[in-house]
């Protein structure tokens, strides 16, 4: 009998240990599997949109077909960040020709715009006057003409169905609705789409956009001309003018997207990074990386607490110097920024700035020599796509601040951008006493400066190594830089490269913002070096990336916005 109880007791003890072991082990091993695909990958900030891009690739579509179909979907599921009432940039890499190109479909100032048109920031953030000429659909058209394989109309069908039949409010849209609750509930056109019984929709509730579905159907059938010189044009102008805007039919008629056949590039070891130049922030990204590559970062740079603290201090100092020079950038068609860009892409110039970084301490703002002040830019969305043939697209799209101008057409369902707010105005001197940037003043037809930097990195054999970009306003450039540093230099896998807690400093204000879950070694090291740090209650930007590995294409969609990649 004793033996029997002894055996039962031993069995019970073993079972307890097994259960405890499972409880400890399961949470760490039953998370989402790594998203590694043998042939192709799509990383967007919404799972359904990644799947739509994947489906287009499986139908025999090109990497650009997949990108356009995914972007149309993102304009619904993350309508607060982007859509056909906004603009975008594509960075495209053709694996056959081994050439990179950029398509510029950024919004531009209407022809009646002028330098002093805004006397207060509210007018540049909300209402018809804040709307710049949208470029999104012209950008899709040009990209499809050059690289599309599937019929134009096919790319629209999944999003037409989503808009018409509805989809659940996701994490990103729910957060934006909560943040902008007051204005949405007070604006009938917005509340018609984004409210139920007068209150903003919650995560998981269904949103439908039947009027936008009709507009997408027209664009699918009639092409981009419907928007710019066709059946939709008069209504678009009417909607914007009735909201106080100055856009004309001629503004839409005359808008053209542009191919840039020689984007900016930088050598990173045996790899090359391609990124758009001004008015985007490619020069800023390149200057950050040029400064930092002189430190020869490696996994050892973050291996010990002391080394990690020093490494992140150096990274923040590079951010400060690069953002100081950003204040001199503008639309190169209107201002001569060639010397500024040459400096920002020069390794010699980066070496000079690196020599001014002191490992023991940071410095006051004036040390970094900011010339002017630039306004913060807003929301955006990004996708990264690689197709079976190894071609790639990085595309970043925006309507600027959450819900753009807050002007939503009750006829077409289009939500228009507030991109005029990205320009500088001579009527505003910022709170730091720094003058606004003349290079970014408003002129008719001019494009405002942006933090976007959709990037593609290829190896010495011309094969895509990494496709990366981000959304998140002024924090985009630093977040893309960190993802590249994490992947290429620190040796992190793509998921960790994207998910690793981030920090940001744009010099004005000279505050280093950190995410709340960042390693305390980093914040302690920054404080020791006299950084003014601040923990953000939110998060710093949203990154989408695809990286080539020995097992295939590893894709990561940032959990900060609830995205998920797809592939096959």
Curated annotation (Swiss-Prot):
Predominant subcellular localization, coarse grouping: membrane
Pfam families listed in its UniProt record: G_glu_transpept (PF01019)
Residues exposed to the Extracellular side: 27-568
Pathway annotation from the record: Sulfur metabolism; glutathione metabolism; Lipid metabolism; leukotriene D4 biosynthesis
A Gene Ontology cellular-component term: vesicle
List of catalytic residues: 380
Reactions listed under catalytic activity: an N-terminal (5-L-glutamyl)-[peptide] + an alpha-amino acid = 5-L-glutamyl amino acid + an N-terminal L-alpha-aminoacyl-[peptide]; glutathione + H2O = L-cysteinylglycine + L-glutamate; an S-substituted glutathione + H2O = an S-substituted L-cysteinylglycine + L-glutamate; leukotriene C4 + H2O = leukotriene D4 + L-glutamate
SUPFAM superfamilies assigned: N-terminal nucleophile aminohydrolases (Ntn hydrolases) (SSF56235)
Record entry for activity regulation: Activated by autocatalytic cleavage.
UniProt keyword annotations, A-Z: Acyltransferase, Cell membrane, Disulfide bond, Glutathione biosynthesis, Glycoprotein, Hydrolase, Membrane, Protease, Sialic acid, Signal-anchor, Transferase, Transmembrane, Transmembrane helix, Zymogen
GO BP field: amino acid metabolic process; cellular response to oxidative stress; cysteine biosynthetic process; fatty acid metabolic process; glutamate metabolic process; glutathione biosynthetic process; glutathione catabolic process; hepatoblast differentiation
Subcellular locations according to the entry: Cell membrane
Transmembrane segments: 5-26
Documented EC number(s): 3.4.19.13, 2.3.2.2, 3.4.19.14
GO MF, one annotated term: leukotriene-C(4) hydrolase
Post-translational modifications reported in the UniProt record: N-glycosylated on both chains; contains sialic acid residues. It is not known if the sialic acid residues are present on N-linked or on O-linked glycans.
Stretches assigned to the Cytoplasmic side: 1-4
Glycosylation sites: 94, 114, 119, 229, 343, 427, 510
Protein family: Belongs to the gamma-glutamyltransferase family.
Quaternary assembly: Heterodimer composed of the light and heavy chains. The active site is located in the light chain.
Protein name in UniProt: Glutathione hydrolase 1 proenzyme
Organism for this UniProt entry: Rattus norvegicus (Rat)
